[in-house]
């Protein structure tokens, strides 16, 4: 199970939104390239990058910053926000992005997601961003008429890298993840699930580690890293030791 630090880009700055609200922006670093280097130096094995301008407008406003981040670090990047065409997906793969995250088009253009997953197996993730169980699109500004569970079920036919499940009500709040919603998604999905939203403490990470064998393979952490609630290096070590202990205990069961 990976702990994946997040960088959200808005006007070229590293920010966090509260529950996806573009009117509640906290700027954490005016140099997102430097921030990416910091996360790699603290042991991150993957970076979660979101183009908030792209998610809202569909325009690649932050491409220069994205390219600079890619050049500055060696770990793989998964990128989402405003990717709504095959041409845009190919542009991002061409500059070295490891995975792209599709959200809005999974609802509006499902055939495009299907085509991309065939052309780029295990390199497409789908973001299921839900509010009260229903999927939101267009940078969380529009509510769809499909439930998160129904969408996860529809995606079972595709060879995805992961489903990134975000509970909008908890995102940016530090109040803990919606564990029940995550377990329901993981139970219904054949694809691996990455948890996102609400992580506020190492205790929250530990609570999700219990479900590593149920299909939750990663946890995205944002605000808690920036405000010091979680130290990335400590969190990675804690989770690693916990999972090793669980594996050791499981092995002991077979030896008894």
Curated annotation (Swiss-Prot):
Where does the UniProt annotation locate this protein? Cytoplasm
| Principal location listed in the UniProt entry | cytoplasm
Q: Which residues form the active site?
A: 8, 129
GO biological process, alphabetically ordered: L-histidine biosynthetic process; L-tryptophan biosynthetic process
| Pathway(s) the chain acts in | Amino-acid biosynthesis; L-histidine biosynthesis; L-histidine from 5-phospho-alpha-D-ribose 1-diphosphate: step 4/9
Q: Does the keyword Amino-acid biosynthesis apply?
A: yes
Reactions catalysed: 1-(5-phospho-beta-D-ribosyl)-5-[(5-phospho-beta-D-ribosylamino)methylideneamino]imidazole-4-carboxamide = 5-[(5-phospho-1-deoxy-D-ribulos-1-ylimino)methylamino]-1-(5-phospho-beta-D-ribosyl)imidazole-4-carboxamide
Q: Which domain of life is it from?
A: Bacteria
Record bears the keyword Isomerase: yes
**Family, as annotated:** Belongs to the HisA/HisF family.
Listed name of the protein: 1-(5-phosphoribosyl)-5-[(5-phosphoribosylamino)methylideneamino] imidazole-4-carboxamide isomerase
């Amino acid at each position: 199970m990976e702990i994946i630090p997040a960088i959200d880009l808005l006007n070229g700055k590293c920010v966090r939104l509260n529950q996806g609200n573009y009117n509640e922006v906290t700027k954490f670093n005016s140099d997102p390239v430097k921030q990416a280097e910091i996360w790699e130096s603290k042991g991150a094995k993957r970076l979660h990058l979101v183009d908030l301008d792209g998610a809202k407008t569909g325009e690649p406003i932050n491409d220069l910053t994205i390219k600079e981040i890619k050049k500055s670090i060696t770990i793989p990047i998964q990128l989402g926000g405003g990717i709504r065409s095959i041409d845009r997906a190919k542009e991002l793969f061409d500059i070295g992005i490891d995975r792209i995250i599709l959200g809005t088009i999974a609802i509006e253009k499902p055939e495009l997601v299907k085509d991309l997953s065939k052309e780029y197996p295990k390199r497409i993730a789908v973001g299921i961003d839900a509010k009260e169980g229903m999927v939101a699109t267009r940078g969380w500004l529009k509510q769809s008429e499909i439930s998160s569970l129904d969408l996860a079920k529809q995606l079972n036919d595709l060879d995805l890298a992961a489903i990134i499940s975000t509970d909008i009500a908890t995102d940016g709040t530090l109040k803990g993840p919606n564990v029940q919603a995550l377990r329901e998604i993981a139970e219904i999905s054949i694809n691996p699930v990455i948890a996102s939203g609400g992580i506020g403490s190492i205790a929250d990470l530990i609570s999700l580690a219990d479900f590593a064998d149920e299909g939750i393979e990663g946890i995205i952490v944002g605000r808690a890293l920036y405000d010091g609630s979680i130290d990335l290096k400590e969190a990675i070590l804690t989770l690693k030791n916990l999972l090793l202990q669980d594996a050791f205990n499981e092995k002991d069961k077979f030896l008894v």
